[in-house]
C-alpha cells in the first residue's frame, strides 16, 4: 500500500537543524474517519516508522534537489538513514494534562513494549543539552 514518508522527512530535517520534533499520533489510524476509531498505539507508531524508513531508503535517489531546501531535505534524510532507526531516542508522552499522564524516555525499539495511553505523542530528540539530559533521566 501507499506509505507517506513526510513525517520522517520532517523529523530528519529537524534533527539536521538540531531541533526536537513533537509528533502527535493519529486519532484515527485507519484514516476512514468513521466507525470505532482507536488512537494509534506506540507499537503501531513503530510499525509505521519502519514502513516509512524502508520507503524513504528506496525513494531517496528520486527526491528532487533543485532548490536549497530540497537539497537540505535530501541531505538530512541521508544523515538520518545512515543511522539506526531502532536506537533512535524518543520520549513517549501519554495522556498529557490528565491524572494519568505519563512520560517515558526510551528508544524506537523499546517503544514497541510500551502501552501508552488514550492519547499519545512522541518527541524525537535531536542533540540534547546537559539540562535536557538530566530531565530525561527522570523518565528512563
Task: Please report, for each region that a protein language model flagged, where it lies by residue.
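Beta-strand/loop-alpha-helix module characteristic of Rossmann-like adenine-cofactor folds
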Residues: 1-140
Amino acid at each position: 500500500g501507499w506509505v507517506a514518508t513526510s513525517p520522517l522527512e520532517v523529523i530528519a530535517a529537524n534533527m539536521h537543524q538540531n531541533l526536537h520534533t513533537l509528533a502527535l499520533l493519529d486519532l484515527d489510524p485507519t484514516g476512514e474517519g468513521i466507525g470505532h476509531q482507536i488512537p494509534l498505539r506506540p507499537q503501531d507508531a513503530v510499525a509505521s516508522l519502519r514502513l516509512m524508513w524502508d520507503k524513504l531508503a528506496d525513494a531517496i535517489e528520486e527526491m528532487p534537489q533543485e532548490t536549497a531546501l530540497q537539497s537540505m531535505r535530501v541531505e538530512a534524510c541521508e544523515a538520518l538513514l545512515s543511522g539506526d532507526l531502532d536506537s533512535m531516542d524518543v520520549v513517549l508522552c501519554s495522556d498529557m494534562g490528565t491524572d494519568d499522564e505519563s512520560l517515558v524516555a526510551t528508544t524506537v525499539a523499546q517503544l514497541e513494549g510500551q502501552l501508552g495511553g488514550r492519547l499519545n505523542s512522541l518527541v524525537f530528540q535531536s542533540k540534547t543539552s546537559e539540562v535536557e539530559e538530566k530531565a530525561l533521566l527522570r523518565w528512563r
